[in-house]
Regions:
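Membrane-embedded alpha-helical segments of integral membrane proteins
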Residues: 1-16
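Internal/C-terminal transmembrane anchor helices
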Residues: 24-45
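Membrane/wall-proximal cationic-aromatic binding patches
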Residues: 41-116, 122-123, 292-296, 304, ...
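Conserved SGNH/GDSL esterase-like catalytic core that processes O-acyl groups on lipids
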Residues: 99-180
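Short, amphipathic alpha-helical "lid/cap" segments that border enzyme active or binding sites
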Residues: 131, 135, 229, 233, ...
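Serine-dependent acyl-ester chemistry module
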Residues: 158-275, 288-294, 298-299, 303, ...
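Histidine-centered active-site loop/cap adjacent to the catalytic His
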Residues: 284, 304-339
Length: 339
C-alpha cells in the first residue's frame, strides 16, 4: 500500500513539471506538496515510530522490535517449571507480560528472580487475559507438574470483573457516561485506518477514545454491584482452591490501580471497597494504590498514551512483594506431602 502513496506523490510531481507553464501548475504543486507531506508522515509512522501505546494496534513497530516470544508463545516465561527448586509463578495480563517495556528484565517478575535465587520464577502473562482466562492458562501451562509450586502471584487489574457481567448486569448497571454514537466520519476514518498508519494513529488516539469512554464507568459500577462482585470473588476463590488442593500452593494477589489519569489513581474509596471484600474473603493481597498515589501517574506510566507500568513502577511492585514476603516468610514455605 505504501508503494501507492509513493506512486501518487511522484505522479503529482510529474504533473508539476508538465504543467509548470500552465495555471493548473499551481494546483498540481499544491497537491504534490500535500501528498509529499502525507507520504512523509505515513513513512514515519509506518517505519520509524517506535513508541508503545495502550492500544495494541498502535504499537506494531514497538512490539515487532521488542516483543520476542518463546516456544510456549509467551515472553521469557522461563517454562517449564523446575523440579529441583521451588517455583514462584507470576500470573497476569499485559502488566505481567511487560507491555510497554523494551526488555523483559524490566518486569517485576525478573526483579524477583534476582532477589530469590533459590526460587525458579515463572512468568505467565499475555495482554487481554482476565481472571477466568488466567485460571485456564495456568491449567494449560502448569498442568499436572512434578515441580513444587510455593506461591502464585496473581497480578490483578481493575477491569477483570467485566468478564463476570451478564447482559442483565449491564442493563442494571449502565455507565454514568452516555455512550457516544459512531458517526459517518468515524466509519470513514476507521476504513482509512486499514490502509494508513498515520490516519490510524491520529484517529485512534484523538477520535476513537470517546466511543469507549463509557466502558470504564460501567466497569467501576460492577465493583459496586454486590451480585457481580460476589460472582467475581467466587471466581477468585475457585482459583485459590485449585492452587491449594492440586499444588499445595498459596495465592498472593497484587492489585494494580488505574494509571490512565491522576484522578483515577487517587480514587482511594473505590479501591478500598474491593480491598475490603478481598479481606473479608480471607485473601492475601497487596494494594499498590497507596504506594502509587504518592508518586503520581507521570512517574509510573510508560507514556501518556500507554498507562502500563514503567520500569520504575515495576520496581515498586517488586519491592512491595519482597517487603510483604519478609513480613510473612511462611508464604514461601512449600508443604511437603507425605506419601
Amino acid at each position: 500500500m505504501f508503494i501507492a502513496y509513493i506512486a501518487i506523490t511522484l505522479l503529482f510531481g510529474l504533473l508539476v513539471y508538465l504543467l509548470r507553464r500552465h495555471r493548473a501548475g499551481n494546483l498540481a504543486l499544491l497537491l504534490f506538496t500535500l501528498c509529499l507531506c502525507f507520504t512523509s508522515l505515513e513513512a514515519y509512522y509506518r517505519f520509524f515510530y517506535l513508541k508503545s501505546d495502550g492500544m495494541g494496534r498502535l504499537m506494531k513497530n514497538f512490539s515487532d522490535r521488542y516483543y520476542q516470544y518463546d516456544s510456549h508463545g509467551l515472553r521469557a516465561s522461563h517454562l517449564p517449571l523446575s523440579r529441583t527448586k521451588d517455583n514462584l509463578i507470576v500470573l497476569g495480563d499485559s502488566h505481567v507480560f511487560g507491555a510497554g517495556l523494551k526488555h523483559p528484565a524490566e518486569r517485576f517478575s525478573e526483579l524477583l528472580t534476582q532477589h530469590y535465587p533459590a526460587l525458579h520464577v515463572v512468568n505467565l502473562g499475555l495482554p487481554g487475559w482476565d481472571t477466568k482466562t488466567e485460571t485456564a492458562q495456568f491449567r494449560k501451562y502448569v498442568g499436572e507438574t512434578d515441580g513444587r509450586v510455593a506461591l502464585v502471584i496473581l497480578t490483578y487489574f481493575y477491569n477483570d470483573i467485566e468478564e463476570e457481567a451478564t447482559p442483565a448486569d449491564r442493563a442494571r448497571d449502565p455507565s454514568p457516561d452516555p455512550p457516544a454514537k459512531e458517526t459517518a466520519l468515524d466509519h470513514a476514518l476507521q476504513f482509512a485506518s486499514k490502509y494508513s498508519r498515520f490516519v490510524e494513529m491520529i484517529y485512534y488516539r484523538l477520535g476513537y477514545p470517546r466511543l469507549v469512554r463509557d466502558r470504564l464507568g460501567q466497569i467501576q459500577r460492577f465493583y459496586s454491584d454486590p451480585v457481580v462482585r460476589e460472582r467475581h470473588l467466587a471466581t477468585l476463590e475457585q482459583f485459590r482452591e485449585l492452587l491449594q488442593e492440586r499444588y499445595s500452593a498459596r495465592l498472593l494477589i497484587v492489585l494494580l490501580p488505574y494509571l490512565h489519569s491522576e484522578s483515577l489513581l487517587q480514587q482511594t474509596k473505590f479501591y478500598q471497597m474491593f480491598e475490603q471484600a478481598l479481606a473479608q474473603g480471607g485473601f492475601d493481597f497487596i494494594s499498590m494504590q497507596p504506594v502509587f498515589a504518592t508518586q503520581g501517574v507521570e512517574k509510573l506510566w510508560v507514556n501518556r498514551f500507554d498507562p502500563h507500568t514503567n520500569p520504575f513502577a515495576n520496581r515498586l511492585v517488586a519491592n512491595a512483594i519482597i517487603e510483604h514476603l519478609n513480613q510473612h516468610p511462611e508464604v514461601l514455605l512449600t508443604p511437603r506431602v507425605t506419601p
